[in-house]
Amino acid sequence: QYMSPRQVTRLIQRVGRSGHRIGRIANGVIITMDSDDTLEAMVIARMAYKEQLEPVDIPHKPYDALAHQIIGLLMKKKRWYFYEIYDMFKNAYPYADLTTEDIQKVLTYMHTRFPRLAWVSFEDQLAIKPRQTKAMYEYYFENLSMIPDEKQYLVVDESSDAAIGVLDEAFTAEYGKPGVKFIIRGSPWKISNVYGDKIYVKSVDDPTGAIPSWIGEEIPVPFEVAQEVASIRGLVEQKIRRGVKPEEIAAQLAKKYPADAETVSRALRETVEHVQRGVLVPTDKRIVVEEWEEFVIIHANFGSLANRALAQLLGYVLSERRSTSVAVQHDPYRIFIQTMGTANVDAIIGLFDDLKKMPNETIQDQLTTATVKTGLFKRRMIHVARRFGAIKKWVDFSTVSLRSLVKSFEGSVIYEEALKEVFTKDLDLQRLLQILDDIKTNKIEILKLETGGNVTPVARVGIERVSMKTDLIPSERMKLILVESAKARLLNEVRTFVCTQNWDYTEMIRLNDLPDKPTCPKCGSTALGVFSREEEQIRSLADKKGEKLTKNEQKWLEQ
């Protein structure tokens, strides 16, 4: 598995494919990308061993499935009273709290749609099979699956004819016009023309006005996983402040998590560097906020859905108060706000103070207002409208205004279902409300980091990640971040040093701790050899001076 599987159930499903026979054992290895990825994978693997799976999230009375099943009933019998439909569906778990008003809303759409899917007498509370049944049968058999059919457009560099990515139809419908600049894979491109299911683009140097492309449905990292990753970082902070060496901490964690000590040590590098700088580490009970140039970075370890909800809420409220647009990005462990000088860390912390005092209803209303403006909502709207039969499966969105389409569904059961789906699959409102309550009751603290304008090591990991998706970080600054990141990683490497003058001194030293001119502490010689092997292996090699070496030892010496 390349990169973290993001969820326990995904890991079990994928690794399980390796042992599909009686008596065989499923084995798997996760190859990670950075420290976030590694710590996340460690937590997920531990949870898999302990059988701590994510709960199954059953949709709450989905209206699109209800409409489809009502058609199925009308195919079997021509006339159904509302109470008959109600009595049948209330016995199914997803519809346990279904009301006759819900049924009436769905039937209103089916009755007013052209051509009709059902003829309805609201006075008699009766649904009747329409005389013209072609549309009804087409709708039923074209929507047997609730899995959304989504058209994707291949983005092609016209100069090389090479594919550089894909865009989903919702983004293409709104912005897929010649001359529009957008960001994909961290670089700005300009649309030259759209031909069929291909979008031809050319590279541009100026990203001004470029629109970040929307990402499809990513697998969300659960709240519990993100919290445990944060608790590991908090534990490392505590132990280092008590004088425990990073190597010892890594060895201890390797006993708890299914990873070797070297892998754990690499995953802790940024956290160790963070603590060594004297900066507070973000933990499961601590939000830290830092400022870097025109960005405010909020370290909030609440997982994908809660962080997305928090990011959208913060971005919306800040935009309304400052009367200017605010760019916001998030990952499961942090939120990036591009304030362009309109707000600083103190203003963001003050915003949290205001949010925690707001009633839950106000939070929900503001988050809803923010959400319906996003590409995420428009994408869900297309999926739901298709499942209701309001949009043909392969409609050409180049001839349709997506904004007008969304507006036309306002107040309908389609709009309501799309909003419900966003709040179920993309945002975690209840978790957000709980987080704000925990901040209010001081169960979670929010602290400002004084960094002197330098980005912290843990934030650096997130910046590298978010730069792959958007132009949030300009390329010239990103180069400096990458150089700084590479420098920090190299300096945190541990190597074994050996005196090649007398072969009586070996020691493992972190490169960051080396003096400008390293010498042997025993004889003062500058003739030091450097190995990536463990100290015990090198010591055994040094003890054999003048003796015949094994093949492996000869290789070490040559290296």
Give residue ranges: language-model regions.
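Conserved segment of the helicase C-terminal RecA-like domain
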Residues: 4-56
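Short alpha-helical segments that sit at the start of domains
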Residues: 52-67
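Short capping segments at the starts of secondary-structure elements
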Residues: 76-81
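Extended, highly charged accessory segments
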Residues: 86-152, 212, 220-559
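Short, basic/aromatic beta-hairpin or loop at an interaction surface
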Residues: 147-166
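Short coil-to-beta transition motif at edge beta-strands of beta-rich domains
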Residues: 167-183
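Short beta-strand-centered aromatic/proline hotspots
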Residues: 187-194
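Short, solvent-exposed secondary-structure boundary/capping segments
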Residues: 195-212
